[in-house]
Amino acid sequence: MKILIVGDQHRTDKRPKNRTDDYYATLIRKTLWQFDFAMRNSCECIIFPGDVFDTYKTPFNVVREMIRLTRKCEDGVIGIKCLYTFGQHDVRYHTTDVNNTPLGVLLAGTSGELLGSEPFIFDNNGKPVHVYGAGWGEDVPEPIDNEACNIIATHRMVIGDNPLWEGQTDYVTAKDLLQDTRYALWACGDNHQRVIASTLRHKHVVNMGSMMRSTIAQFGHTPAVCLYDTDTRRISIHDIPHAPFENVFKADEIAEKVETDTRIQDFVESLKSVDTSVTDFPKALAAYMQTNDIPDNVVTIINKITNMEKYHG
């Protein structure tokens, strides 16, 4: 059987400040494309690994429209099952109760299921597929049948080889998850950038990133979905049709980011001349910044991540 794994949806009708297009219309179009892709590829279910909505305050009209679109997908010729975990954006005040939330209303208005420690089971012609869930802050459950194709949908920060920012601690690497032999597939959410990792024995960690690009920081992100075949245990990645980044974001903001990234790269390259063996490296670095022509925006960023303001002056 085939399963579609999507990224964080962050459904909302609010346009991010640097977007220039009709954001909600784009969100609807991508949502429809995902459902259509699942139907065209005979998927039996779609896994939504958390942050289905952008906030628990999502307007009723958005929730109502998502119920309508989801029902059309569920009631089609194939009858696709939508399976969900919750992210921190889906719940009120960081609790685990989704009942009085947009996600809870979506579940009540459709045949969707909230995944948990008890598996949602597909027979798959005698080759059972068990799908579990671990929402934001929840522990990963123990599978009840090691002979089944066990899949876990989870909302946690999964990264590649390196932290996303200096000092990041609350994460797990995709390689670490691949060492966990309990699950054939980890369908993850939370990280808005794509992370894919696989073994030669066809174990996979899939984090598709966000469906929508909401910030300039996602300059290099390509929205996509993952198609998983439980029989072959193979995955394939498919890009969601989307406009070029410069067509939907403010041009001056893009130019500023590119310029800042370039200056930071130049600064990092210039740091090779700083003696890293000195006892007080932060002080030496601050002195270097004061005696060299370092752009103000680069200085600001360095100060934020190193807390070096105290060395200035």
Tell what function each PLM region has:
Residues 1-25, 140-160, 284-298, 302, ...:
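Mobile, glycine- and charge-enriched loop segments
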Residues 244-313:
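Non-catalytic terminal accessory segments
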Residues 73-78, 144-146, 177-182, 200:
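Short, conserved loop/helix-junction motifs that constitute active-site signature segments
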Residues 206-270:
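Binuclear metal-dependent phosphoesterase catalytic core
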Residues 66, 83-176:
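Conserved catalytic scaffold of divalent metal-dependent phosphoesterases
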Residues 5-7, 45-51, 81-88, 113-118, ...:
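Active-site neighborhood of phospho(di)ester-bond hydrolases with catalytic His/Asp-centered motifs
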Residues 166-233:
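Conserved beta-sheet core of the metallophosphoesterase superfamily
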Residues 9, 16-121:
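Core catalytic region of metal-dependent phosphoesterases/phosphodiesterases
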